[in-house]
Design a protein with these regions (language model features):
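Non-catalytic, usually N-terminal nucleic-acid engagement modules in DNA/RNA processing proteins
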Residues: 1-183, 300-303
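A non-catalytic, amphipathic alpha-helix used as a structural packing/dimerization or gating element
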Residues: 130, 134, 161, 165-172, ...
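Conserved, mostly hydrophobic/aromatic
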Residues: 25, 58, 93, 135, ...
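Glycine- and acidic
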Residues: 152-156, 160, 220-227, 335-338
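Structural signal for hydrophobic packing residues in well-ordered secondary-structure cores
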Residues: 139, 170, 174-177, 181, ...
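Glycine-rich phosphate/ribose-binding loops and adjacent secondary-structure elements
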Residues: 164, 176, 180, 185-309
Length: 380
């Protein structure tokens, strides 16, 4: 069973600092969670995730792990923690977003989500019940309820229909979760996902419905269906609608977000947990996030820059390698370039939430955030 305690609140915003306790260790919030979709954070050794990046919790994805390596392998391995040799907390998404974004053929009904594999075209179905069973076999500490990720530009009628489907699935998912047990000797908790697209009344209805199902097995609440095509200001507006309605004694997780500025703005609105592929995916393409802004390491301006990769960075790679050297590696399409950039970006994202936490505790988060955000968005 997970437990969340809030240790500090910002007096000028909804930001808060907390501790999320799981059987695989504590997570200090606000936190960023590196995405390890198929049991691996792309381009990073676990050694570096632990000692350099200082990741406290990572993600896995049910859709990908269900398809490959498959549930038989994961069960024989004793779950994902043992399979990938990671003894800190893991969170798994239900796979709903991946069905929405990857599956070439999909059909959503009250029964569940029928889809074809993007790997070999084979046919599958996720129901709320078998999705619980699948995530029990994977064995993450925190599991997400099955939902439909509604497109950001959906009209009200579609969004309302989508929410009704998600609510029906949530009722069955929560009931089956409560009737089943973890498989590997440690506890698991589940987060309902609050949907509703960009419509405040739908978000409010989603929270009201989810809270009717609240009990000790609901370790927190996720806010989904944002950063999927809607304007950024709409995302912030939906957080302002949703977060105040959620329990104060449970963590809030904003799924799939986002840029460093998005994360700080999310913290200011009461979010505790974040994940995003941006630091890894953009890093592989030469984009580095820093306190001074965003660097494109493919740009010729770095050709003769022999200064450290990031003088303000805390990662090993930041002081060990020069900008000129990493620029060369990207131009030469060396695999190592992507590894260095990924390590830097993930370390920066973890630094970002760590420093944000320090300012929440110190009581000056909002002025600090307001001063930092414009710099984070600059192009260097």
């Amino acid at each position: 069973m997970s437990h969340f305690s809030c240790i500090a609140r910002d007096s000028q915003s909804a930001a808060r600092a907390g501790v999320l306790a799981t059987d695989h260790g504590e997570v200090l919030t606000p936190i960023f969670m590196p995405v390890g979709t198929v049991g691996s954070v792309k381009g990073v050794y676990h050694r570096d995730l632990l000692s350099d990046i200082k990741a406290q919790i990572i993600l896995g994805n049910t859709y990908h792990l269900y398809l490959r390596p498959g549930l038989d392998t994961l069960r024989k391995a004793g779950g994902l923690h043992k399979f990938e040799h990671w003894d800190r907390p893991i969170l798994t998404d239900s796979g709903g977003f991946q069905v929405f974004s990857l599956a070439p053929i999909r059909k959503l009904t009250e029964e569940g989500c029928k889809f074809s594999s993007h790997i070999d075209g084979s046919k599958h179905i996720f129901t709320p019940e078998n999705n619980v069973d699948t995530q029990r076999i994977i064995g993450a500490d925190i599991i997400m309820a099955l939902d439909e990720c509604c497109p950001g530009d959906a009209d009200y009628r579609y969004a309302a229909k989508s929410l009704k489907l998600t609510q029906g699935w949530l009722e069955r998912f929560a009931a089956h979760f409560d009737q089943t047990e973890p498989l590997y000797g440690y506890s698991q908790t589940m987060f309902p996902i609050i949907q509703g697209c960009v419509y405040p009344d739908l978000r409010e209805k989603a929270v009201e419905h989810a809270l009717k199902l609240d009990n000790e097995n609901r370790g927190g609440y996720a806010v989904g269906g944002l950063a999927v095509g809607e304007p950024t200001e709409k995302m912030y507006e939906m957080l302002e609608v949703t977060c105040p309605l959620l329990p104060q004694d449970k963590p809030r997780y904003l799924m799939g977000v986002g840029t460093p500025a998005n994360i700080l703005e999310g913290i200011a609105r009461g979010i505790d947990m974040f994940d995003c592929v941006m630091p890894t995916r953009n890093g592989r393409n030469g984009m580095l996030f820093t306190w001074d802004g965003v660097m494109n390491m493919r740009n010729a301006k770095w050709t003769d820059d022999f200064g450290p990769l990031d003088p303000l960075g805390t990662s090993f790679v930041d002081s060990y390698y020069t900008r000129a050297y990493i620029h060369l590696l990207f131009i030469a399409k060396e695999m190592f370039a992507a590894m260095v950039a990924t390590e830097h970006n993930l370390a920066f994202y973890l630094d970002l939430v760590r420093v944000a936490r320090e300012h929440i505790v110190a009581g000056d988060f909002l002025p600090w955030k307001n001063a930092v955000v414009p710099k984070l968005m600059q192009r260097l």
